[in-house]
UniProtKB/Swiss-Prot annotation:
<protein>
    <recommendedName>
        <fullName>Tektin-5</fullName>
    </recommendedName>
</protein>
<dbReference type="GO" id="GO:0030317">
    <property type="term" value="P:flagellated sperm motility"/>
</dbReference>
<keyword id="KW-0282">Flagellum</keyword>
<keyword id="KW-0206">Cytoskeleton</keyword>
<dbReference type="InterPro" id="IPR000435">
    <property type="entry name" value="Tektins"/>
</dbReference>
<dbReference type="Pfam" id="PF03148">
    <property type="entry name" value="Tektin"/>
</dbReference>
<dbReference type="InterPro" id="IPR048256">
    <property type="entry name" value="Tektin-like"/>
</dbReference>
<feature type="coiled-coil region">
    <location>
        <begin position="225"/>
        <end position="264"/>
    </location>
</feature>
<keyword id="KW-0966">Cell projection</keyword>
<feature type="coiled-coil region">
    <location>
        <begin position="346"/>
        <end position="383"/>
    </location>
</feature>
<keyword id="KW-0832">Ubl conjugation</keyword>
<comment type="similarity">
    <text>Belongs to the tektin family.</text>
</comment>
<dbReference type="GO" id="GO:0160111">
    <property type="term" value="C:axonemal A tubule inner sheath"/>
</dbReference>
<comment type="function">
    <text>Sperm-specific microtubule inner protein (MIP) part of the dynein-decorated doublet microtubules (DMTs) in flagellar axoneme. Forms an extensive interaction network in different conformations that reinforces the helix bundle composed by other tektin proteins (TEKT1 to TEKT4) and MIPs to anchor the tektin bundle onto the tubulin wall of A-tubule of the sperm flagellum.</text>
</comment>
<dbReference type="GO" id="GO:0060294">
    <property type="term" value="P:cilium movement involved in cell motility"/>
</dbReference>
<feature type="coiled-coil region">
    <location>
        <begin position="427"/>
        <end position="447"/>
    </location>
</feature>
<dbReference type="GO" id="GO:0060271">
    <property type="term" value="P:cilium assembly"/>
</dbReference>
Length: 489
């Protein structure tokens, strides 16, 4: 049997060769290195495979015995007649060969180790340099994205501000138009607004559906508006044309805002991406695609032009409203008192509703805090119960194990008393905690019911406040009964 790592030239594997020139076996050629690696490219890393080894190594087995040596061994076998007459037929290496071989092995190992150490150090420095470069590039990109988000936020705020002012102007202009048309049709629009307030207030819920001072003043105002007549048709036509132009400017602002919202969402998503994000992937050749259609200068100019156009439209609208306001002065004296009285009643009612709503919200906040504390108490009680179960299991297991003691060893000793007492004590503790847990849960249920009632009352008050403040008062801001009704603040 041939052992792994042995050669056929060892002294115990064959007789001595007849040649006397050399006592050493022929030296086999060194390990042959074959380049057999075909690189495998990951997606996006066709030219970034420096982290993989460039070679696989295959070591060829050395031929350690020549054909002639085999012939010599087969020809010269030692005689088996008398062991005493055997000659020294086995060749051996010299101590110098042995020392030289060891030195060569040690030197080779040391050289390989030093080379590997240098390669490791260089690799670590290379990785650190590339990591620092990658981190700096990523931080720079994040800063640029943050600056871009700041620019988008600035223009969004400008567009929102202008859009809000344009919308307010459109509402005001629409109110002027309605007032002019209604003046031409015997002030039917003021009558409709007053009736709409009454209609909206009919949508109040529950106890808030009261016949209050606001409703009385609205009914009185409806009766007074029916007496007013005026015609302003020509100015209404000009206002209608201006409103169409305002809507065009509004749509341009809204489209610009929508695009900026989308861009802000995308850039914010890009800014929040990290190396550990789940949604990152390879996109081959994306850096070669340039689908941009603007530069920062033209991008800013586009929004600035939209804002300037909207400002021009608002200026035209303001001039038209001022012209209409001069016509409304004739009607102002007749409806001023009733309009003021109704508004004062609305403000007083809104103040009352706001005060009640704030009190309910305060009580709801306290109730929610108490619910939170009660839930925490329930959680702590449940944890405490769970924490007591393991000691109870331990004590019961100990008792059960001690019941298996043999014969007279089954003694009612001090540990037995202690274990029994421990089981009773822990069980009593568990029962007490479970009772307290049930009581706490009942309290939590009561608090939840209270919260539901408060939320229902808050919904009623919020609905009433929305009707009076957001709907009725918003409509009455464009109500044509005072000199200032043509211009919205």
């Amino acid at each position: 049997m041939e052992f792994l790592g042995t050669t056929q030239t060892a002294t115990y594997c064959g007789p001595k060769k007849p040649c006397g020139g050399s006592v050493l076996p022929s030296v086999a050629s060194g390990p042959t290195v074959q380049e057999c690696y075909q690189p495998y490219y990951l997606p996006g890393y066709r030219y970034l495979n420096a982290w993989r080894p460039s070679l696989f190594y295959k070591v060829a087995n050395a031929q350690t015995c020549l054909d002639e040596g085999a012939t010599c061994r087969s020809a010269l076998r030692p005689p088996t007649i008398l062991p005493a007459v055997r000659s020294a037929l086995f060749c051996r290496y010299s101590p110098q060969d042995w020392d030289q071989s060891n030195r060569l092995q040690l030197c080779g190992a040391e050289a390989s180790r030093l080379w590997a150490g240098r390669m490791t150090g260089d690799s670590m420095r290379l990785m650190q340099d590339k990591d620092q470069l990658t981190r700096q590039m990523q931080e720079g990109t994040c800063r640029n994205l943050g600056q871009r988000l700041s620019d988008i936020g600035f223009w969004k705020s400008e567009l929102n501000y202008e859009l809000e002012r344009l919308l307010n102007e459109n509402h005001s202009l629409d109110a002027i138009k309605r007032r002019l048309e209604c003046a031409a049709e015997e002030l039917r629009c003021p009558l409709q607004v007053a009736l709409e307030c009454l209609y909206q207030r009919e949508k109040r819920i529950g106890i808030d559906l009261v016949h209050d001072n606001v409703e009385k003043n609205l009914i009185r105002e409806v009766d007074m508006i029916k007496c007013c007549q005026e015609q302003m048709r020509k100015l209404a036509q000009r206002i209608d044309i201006q409103m169409r132009e305002n809507r065009d400017a509004q749509h341009a602002l809204e489209r610009d805002l929508e695009d900026k919202n989308s861009a802000e969402f995308i850039d914010e998503k890009c800014l929040n991406l990290r190396n550990t994000s789940d949604c990152i992937s390879f996109f081959h050749g994306v850096e070669k695609i340039d689908g941009t259609i603007s530069v920062p200068e033209t991008w800013a100019k586009f929004s600035n032009d939209n804002i300037r156009h909207s400002q021009n439209m608002r200026a035209n609208s303001i001039r038209l409203r001022e012209e209409a306001q001069n016509l409304f002065d004739v009607l102002a004296d007749q409806l001023w008192r009733q309009f003021t009285n109704t508004n004062l009643a609305f403000n007083a009612r809104i103040a009352e509703e706001t005060d009640v709503k704030n009190k309910l919200q305060t009580q709801l906040a306290k109730t929610l805090q108490e619910i939170f504390q009660t839930e925490n108490t329930i959680m702590l009680l449940e944890r405490s119960i769970m924490a007591k179960e393991c000691p109870l299991k331990v004590a019961q297991t100990r008792l059960e194990c001690r019941t298996r003691r043999p014969n007279v060893e089954l003694c009612r000793d001090s540990p037995q008393f202690k274990l029994v007492n421990e089981v009773f004590t822990i069980d009593d503790t568990l029962q007490t905690l479970k009772l307290r847990l049930r009581e706490t849960r009942d309290t939590l249920q009561l608090l939840v019911m209270t919260k539901c009632r408060l939320e229902h009352e808050l919904a009623i008050k919020a609905n009433t406040l929305c009707i009076d403040k957001e709907k009725c008062m918003a409509m009455r801001k464009t109500f044509p009964s005072t000199p200032c009704m043509g211009i919205c603040p």
